[in-house]
Each structure stands twice: as structure tokens, then as C-alpha cells.
Regions:
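Short acidic-glycine-tyrosine-enriched beta hairpin
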Residues: 76-91
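Short beta-strand His + acidic residue motifs that chelate non-heme Fe in jelly-roll/DSBH
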Residues: 52-54, 72-73, 89, 95-101
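A generic "binding-loop/recognition-motif" signal
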Residues: 58-59, 77, 93-94, 103, ...
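Conserved short histidine dyad/triad with adjacent acidic residue
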Residues: 25, 41-56
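Glycine- and acidic-residue-biased ligand/ion/polar-headgroup-sensing regions
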Residues: 58-60, 64-70
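A short, N-terminal "cap"/entry segment at the start of jelly-roll beta-barrel domains
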Residues: 1-38, 122-149
Length: 149
């Protein structure tokens, strides 16, 4: 792979997809295997949504919670996650992420190497971002939030 220069973008110009139409999570594809030797996405889980249990032969997978609450399951270990939590899953470990909170769960996920995960995402149906997604991803605060009397 030859990387010609800086990879730069904005989430509003990125593809948004699901792996399958029935999935309870969607992906904002920030950077894929054609741009760098890894994939980076914002994974958005609907309330009650989850990934299927899965593992990767070679890839390390890094998760950082941007918003919401959930559970990370790695092997037999299960732990609560919330905004600011992060965890790394080494290759060969079965893992799953579940949204257990009220509202959506937003997770920045990076997988190194890509292991063709970006191809799997790009082969799925298109999805879209709604107002709540745009608010969370842009860092905007809801009306009245962060004000002091």
C-alpha cells in the first residue's frame, strides 16, 4: 500500500452504512483500508442494539465511547462502559458491544489491520444520520445545556 499524502475529511462527507438491513448499529466510515492499513469508524448503536459476538484473526480493535452507556464483553469478562471509557481487544478474542443505556451509544472504533472489515461495511446497505447523530458527532450541546444561572 502506498499512501500518497494526508488523509483528511469530515464526518458529514463520510459513507454511513449498516452491514445488513436488520442490524441495530450503523457505521460512519471515517477511514478505510484503501486510505490506510486500518479502518476507523464511528459505530452508532440504537437503544438495545449490539454487535454479534465476533473475533479477528490478526487485528487489534480499539473502542472509545463518545456518548451513551453500554457493556463490553471480551471472552468471559463483562464490564460497563460509558462516555470516556475505552478498551482494546487483542486478536483472537471473542467480543461484543451492547447498548444498555437510554438513547443511542456512539463508539469510535479502530481496527488495525483492517482485515477487510471496511469492505464488509461498504458492501452493506446505505444508512443516514439524523439530528441526534449530527448533534453528538459535531459536539453540539442540546439547547440549555452547559449554561449557568
Amino acid at each position: 500500500m502506498t499512501i500518497q499524502g494526508l488523509v483528511l475529511g469530515h464526518f458529514e462527507q463520510c459513507e454511513v452504512r449498516k452491514i445488513s438491513a436488520r442490524d441495530t448499529n450503523k457505521f460512519v466510515l471515517l477511514c478505510d483500508g484503501t486510505q490506510a492499513p486500518f479502518v476507523s469508524v464511528v459505530e452508532i448503536f440504537d437503544e438495545g442494539g449490539q454487535t454479534p459476538p465476533n473475533e479477528h484473526a490478526e487485528a487489534f480493535e480499539y473502542f472509545y465511547v463518545l456518548e451513551g452507556e453500554g457493556t463490553a464483553i471480551v471472552g468471559e469478562a463483562e464490564t460497563d462502559i460509558r462516555k470516556g471509557s475505552f478498551f482494546v481487544v487483542p486478536p483472537g478474542n471473542n467480543h461484543q458491544v451492547r447498548n444498555t443505556g437510554a438513547g443511542r451509544l456512539y463508539v469510535l472504533t479502530t481496527m488495525v489491520p483492517d482485515e477487510k472489515f471496511s469492505d464488509l461495511i461498504k458492501a452493506g446497505p446505505a444508512a443516514s444520520l439524523d439530528e441526534e447523530d449530527l448533534r453528538v458527532l459535531s459536539g453540539a450541546r442540546p439547547a440549555g445545556a452547559g449554561t449557568f444561572a
